[in-house]
Every structure is written in structure tokens, then in C-alpha cells.
Curated annotation (Swiss-Prot):
Belongs to the rotavirus A NSP6 family. Its main location: host cell. This is Non-structural protein 6. It comes from Rotavirus A (strain RVA/Human/Japan/AU-1/1982/G3P3[9]). Pfam families: Rota_NS6 (PF04866).
Length: 74
């Protein structure tokens, strides 16, 4: 599996995880959901990028996506 395929798979898994989490938390308030979502995204991003320098740029991009997602949810 090359870097592009790994990156695509990671982003797909991340989106699936975020989507599932969001649906599970819809009963709670939006701000609680957003905070929980950020914690989960932080964990996933760190887990996926900690061992690979190739993913450092991805980590920055994902943090930006995370912030935008939060603003969009609000």
C-alpha cells in the first residue's frame, strides 16, 4: 500500500468514525458533542501520525479540518 492509499484509507476511516460518533451524540447538546468530537479526532490523528513523519503535514491539515468541522457544527 503506497502513501496515497494509506492516506485515503485513514481519511475514510476518520470520516466513518466521526460520522458514527456524531450520530451517537445527537441527543446531547451541540457544544458537548463538539468537545467530544475534538477529543476523539485528536486521539485518532495522534494515533495515526505519531510514528510516521510522512503524516506530519496531514496532521496539520486534519487539525484545520477539525476546526472547520467544529465551526460548521456550531
Amino acid at each position: 500500500m503506497n502513501h496515497l492509499q494509506q492516506r485515503q484509507l485513514f481519511l475514510e476511516n476518520l470520516l466513518v468514525g466521526v460520522n458514527n460518533t456524531f450520530h451517537q451524540m445527537q441527543k446531547r447538546s451541540v457544544s458537548t458533542c463538539c468537545q467530544s468530537l475534538q477529543k476523539i479526532l485528536d486521539h485518532l490523528i495522534l494515533l495515526q501520525t505519531i510514528h510516521s513523519p510522512v503524516f506530519r503535514l496531514d496532521r496539520m491539515q486534519l487539525r484545520q479540518m477539525q476546526t472547520l468541522a467544529c465551526l460548521w457544527i456550531h
